Amino acid sequence: MAQSDITIDALDKVGRQDAEYLVSLVRSIPGFPKEGIIFRDFIPVFADPKGLRILLEALEAALPVPASEFDSIAGLESRGFLFGPALAARMGKGFIAVRKAGKLPPETIGESYDLEYGSARVEIETDAVQAGERVLIVDDLIATGGTAKAATDLIDKVGGTVAGYGFVMRLEGLDGIDKLGGKPVSSLMAMPA
C-alpha cells in the first residue's frame, strides 16, 4: 500500500515538510504478521537522526494533556520502548515499562487482552507506579485499543491514574480509542486498517 494512504494528524505542528519527511520513513508491509494485515513499520525512523528528531518534537508538541498534568510516561512494549524513554528524558519525567508477560522480575501484576491478530498479556512491576501518580501512556500504534486498555487497567490496579494517551499512528475504523474511557488521546498520523 502506498504511503499516500497515511494522513497527517498532529504532525503539522512540526511543519508540513518535516511531517511529510517523517511519513516517508514509515514502511507498509502487507501480509505481516499474517495474511490480511498491513504492518506499519516505523523502525526506519530510528535509523534516521532527522526522522527521530522530528518524531520526538512532534510527540511533545502534540501531547494530549499539558506536561504539568502527568508525572511519568509509560511505554508499551516494544516500540513504545524506543521513543518513550527519550520523550520522558526530554520532558524531565520518569519512564515506566509495560512489558509482555514473563519479561520482568517478580513481583508483577498482569492483564490479558485481545490484539487485531491474536491475544496477549502485559505486566508491570507492582512498585513501578506510586499511589496517585499520573501517567501518560505512549505507543507506536492504536488499533483495537486492547494493549492500551490493558496498560490502563494495570496502572489503575497499582493506584495510579492515566492522564492520557499519545500514539504515533492510529488505524482508522477499528475504534480502539473508544476503549480508552474518554481520556485525552493524541496521534500523529492515521491510516486505514
Curated annotation (Swiss-Prot):
SUPFAM superfamilies named among the record's database cross-references: PRTase-like
Which reaction does this enzyme catalyse, per its entry?
Answer: AMP + diphosphate = 5-phospho-alpha-D-ribose 1-diphosphate + adenine
- Which GO terms of the molecular function aspect are on file? adenine binding; adenine phosphoribosyltransferase activity; AMP binding
Which PROSITE patterns does this entry report, sorted A to Z?
PUR_PYR_PR_TRANSFER (PS00103)
List the EC numbers from the record.
2.4.2.7
Can you say what this protein is called? Answer: Adenine phosphoribosyltransferase
What are the recorded Gene Ontology BP terms? Answer: adenine salvage; AMP salvage; purine ribonucleoside salvage
Where is this chain's protein located in or outside the cell? Cytoplasm
Q: Sum up the protein's function in the record's words.
A: Catalyzes a salvage reaction resulting in the formation of AMP, that is energically less costly than de novo synthesis.
- Copy the pathway line from the protein's UniProt record: Purine metabolism; AMP biosynthesis via salvage pathway; AMP from adenine: step 1/1
Q: Recite the UniProt keywords alphabetically.
A: Cytoplasm, Glycosyltransferase, Purine salvage, Transferase
Q: Does the keyword Lyase apply?
A: no
Q: Has the keyword Transferase been applied to this entry? A: yes
InterPro entries listed in its UniProt record? Ade_phspho_trans, PRibTrfase_dom, PRTase-like, UPRTase/APRTase
- Which gene is transcribed and translated to give this protein? apt
Name the principal localization, coarsely classed: cytoplasm
